[in-house]
């Protein structure tokens, strides 16, 4: 296998669900570099990400608390080794005390939490005592603690299974709209819990990330088109770009000119171009911002009205309520996200946290 071990091929297959021979070929191409092999398979349209959720997991809870005046909110991810322990009354009490300590000492990170006092001793000692009593490693892995300035509210949503939580902050101008803004924030938080946007806005992406994702996206669409062609179905447009951050004024002006030249060649009278070109530009932007539509909160289509993006929903509410709304905060925790469900890895993370 050209120096590529069977174990490495199996690991790549577990991570991507690609075929065994495809995994072997990818590893040979990149001299055994696992991350490069994953990227290679994605760019070839051979990686199936659907299994990811089954592989990356840890037990415990995501818990949040929103202040009654919607001016502050806390969210925490606490991991245990088994879901059985996560349902234990002692574990539930630990979650309660964690939130109380975060609130009392204005804590924003797990490191700050461990050093903070609880019942006249460091929280770290309390956590060690609970680990001894409960009999499993327990890790306070993530903390979000948001506070709203004037003319802002914060609301959130925690899924009933305690595995997903979201906090949303919205700025507004008209105080009479506060109750409606609170409800809107909760509805958007529910959307985010289900649809898993990675970031708030495309501006949060790096250009390198967008270029890499665009290559994978093009490979995916080309593969879908092969199947569509075989079945006699309409083909999807192949994008040139993936995100709005790539669509500069120059790019848009060039595309507008291309559409005008196209209409001229078709013999369409110039006086009707302004009725045709805007629709073509809208379609061009939609086809070339697919990464935003998949991965950004503002770019996703709203689950309660799939004809509108979240950005359009916020804009429509601004117009309807005579206000100027803006989503300013977005935090989403999903239990175990980024942790492989392997005891040794979890133990290492706990050990690092306890140092």
From Swiss-Prot:
Region (Involved in Mg(2+) ion dislocation from EF-Tu): 82-85
One MF term in the entry's GO annotations: translation elongation factor activity
Domain of life from the UniProt record: Bacteria
Any one annotated GO CC term: cytoplasm
CDD domains, per the entry: UBA_EF-Ts (cd14275)
Entry's localization field: Cytoplasm
Residue ranges of coiled coil: none
NCBIfam families: tsf
UniProt function note: Associates with the EF-Tu.GDP complex and induces the exchange of GDP to GTP. It remains bound to the aminoacyl-tRNA.EF-Tu.GTP complex up to the GTP hydrolysis stage on the ribosome.
Protein's UniProt name: Elongation factor Ts
